[in-house]
Amino acid sequence: MLEFAVSAPFDPAADISAGIIPAQFPWLSLSILFPIVGSLMVPFIPDQGDGRQVRWFALGIALTTFLITVAAYLNGYDPSFSGLQLSERVSWLPNLGLTWAVGADGLSMPLILLTSFITTLAVLAAWPVTFKPKLFFFLMLAMDGGQIAVFAVQDMLLFFLAWELELLPVYLLLAIWGGKKRQYAATKFILYTAGSSLFILLAALAMGFMGGGTPNFEYAVLAQKGFSTSFQLLCYAGLLIAFGVKLPIVPLHTWLPDAHGEATAPVHMLLAGILLKMGGYALMRFNAEMLPDAHAQFAPLLVVLGVVNIIYAALTSFAQRNLKRKIAYSSISHMGFVLIGIGSFSALGTSGAMLQMISHGLIGASLFFLVGATYDRTHTLQLDEMGGVGQKMRIMFALWTVCSLASLALPGMSGFVSELMVFTGFATDEAYTLTFRIVIDGLAAVGVILTPIYLLSMLREIFFGKENVQLASNTNLVDAEPREVYIIGCLLVPIIGIGLYPRLMTDSYRTAIEALVDRDVAAMETISRPTAPLIRNPSLAPALLQAPKLP
């Protein structure tokens, strides 16, 4: 018979000696449960049918959740400590090894802040929603709690539950409020993501029950189990498929252009700003941290897949005449740098991968919000039908220009710093042979060159292309309103701030990244050989040298 325990008392001294700092206040549990409870209250809010009261309520809940995460960072998080902080643990179903365990470290805290920040702005972006507003904002708030849980939980079964929790809101947001092909896009999304998540469940059960005795799925316990290399390789392959769908990795990416092609602006912001980052985070947390022996052999494959992402998606973006799909493929290209950074054995490269996730979350959210704002005015997404609207929408053109420059990694913007860190970190990573490093950085540079070409040509076609007489006479072509300027302004502040002073962000996860890389380098030095199963070509094999430290 299953047992239910109310609490499992902490031993602070034992926790600290194990690299865990208990929470003095349940900040993370509050940040997860507050938006979920708020979403359950939405149906009971009196409403006239226009959704005004619901909008303000949802904004208040989302903003409060953001302030809770900020308070957690300021009051309970120490960036200089590499272990788990803000830790909370409650025994739930001990016979199944299921524990309510949450906490934060350098891998998760920045993404928790990003999630609550982007969600708050997405709620503000959803202000024009008048069709079933209660259901819409209920799903938005439920998704907020689920996404924070993905980054905060410290139990692999809880991670799986949180991973699944955010799938249903996205499916409904696509299927109900999407475009003409919304049913197809939503069905494809749920089939890809729910189907691939089966690998997470299988890996969690295998890792938790391995070794016999009472199962335990807590990250700290799993990381110390010392799985065999063959077992790690099997789990790594399954998790790579599951997380590769969400990142996404080519060829597991085809759901993303369809989803973005049919989504509304607020859903765009959540997809690009948060959902894709879940895949990158999970690769770091599980594949690189818990399965270091397998990671040492799979890392070159991640690097190659990253280059494929960068070049393939950039070239495909050229061919897109649909504005949403063009930006969607641009997102896939930029996430390729995350794969290269995770596959590197240098603290600088891996830190660049983390910064690239944060940077792309901000930049991707801004671009997709502008796509939605532009569509509300032009009622078309086809670049061939746009053009000649720059004079009528000068502020909108300025916002598009700044955000596009951020996306193409202009110096002074966050994207430049993150991509430079990945390039430099991999180029100086002596864990790989010189030939391999030159080839990878050279191919990745091709993607960097392609990005400004398709982004700047896109701007020209939207605002300064051949004038569409019917579109130019459209009375809906009003310039950006204050709400839209405010949303983009809120996103540009951290984009420019990080670009000018990257340590604003990198200091928050520096020690955690260094600890992760040290663990992977130790595993590489132990088991990597020029004839490793996945890399029989000696030019691709790790050179067994010490990776450089993050300066």
From Swiss-Prot:
Decide whether keyword Endoplasmic reticulum is in the record. Answer: no
- Protein's membrane topology: Multi-pass membrane protein
Pfam families linked to this entry: Proton_antipo_M
Family designation: Belongs to the complex I subunit 4 family.
Q: Which GO terms describe its cellular component?
A: plasma membrane-derived thylakoid membrane
Lineage, top ranks? Bacteria, Bacillati, Cyanobacteriota, Cyanophyceae, Synechococcales
> Membrane-spanning regions, if any?
25-45, 56-76, 111-131, 133-153, 157-177, 189-209, 233-253, 264-284, 298-318, 335-355, 356-376, 397-417, 438-458, 485-505
| Gene Ontology molecular function | NADH dehydrogenase (ubiquinone) activity; ubiquinone binding
Q: Taking the first listed entry, what is the main subcellular location of this protein, grouped into a coarse class?
A: membrane
**What residue range is the signal peptide?**
none
EC numbers for this chain: 7.1.1.-
Describe its function.
Answer: NDH-1 shuttles electrons from NAD(P)H, via FMN and iron-sulfur (Fe-S) centers, to quinones in the respiratory chain. The immediate electron acceptor for the enzyme in this species is believed to be plastoquinone. Couples the redox reaction to proton translocation (for every two electrons transferred, four hydrogen ions are translocated across the cytoplasmic membrane), and thus conserves the redox energy in a proton gradient.
Which HAMAP family does the UniProt entry name for this protein?
A: NDH1_NuoM (MF_00491)
Originating gene? ndhD
Source taxon at top rank: Bacteria
Descriptive protein name: NAD(P)H-quinone oxidoreductase chain 4
- What GO biological process terms does the UniProt entry carry, in alphabetical order? ATP synthesis coupled electron transport; electron transport coupled proton transport
Subcellular localization(s) per the UniProt record: Cellular thylakoid membrane
User: What does it catalyze?
Assistant: a plastoquinone + NADH + (n+1) H(+)(in) = a plastoquinol + NAD(+) + n H(+)(out); a plastoquinone + NADPH + (n+1) H(+)(in) = a plastoquinol + NADP(+) + n H(+)(out)
What are the UniProt keywords, alphabetically? Membrane, NAD, NADP, Plastoquinone, Quinone, Thylakoid, Translocase, Transmembrane, Transmembrane helix
Q: Does the keyword Thylakoid apply?
A: yes
- NCBIfam families the record matches: NDH_I_M (TIGR01972), PRK02546.1 (NF002713), PRK12561.1 (NF009212)
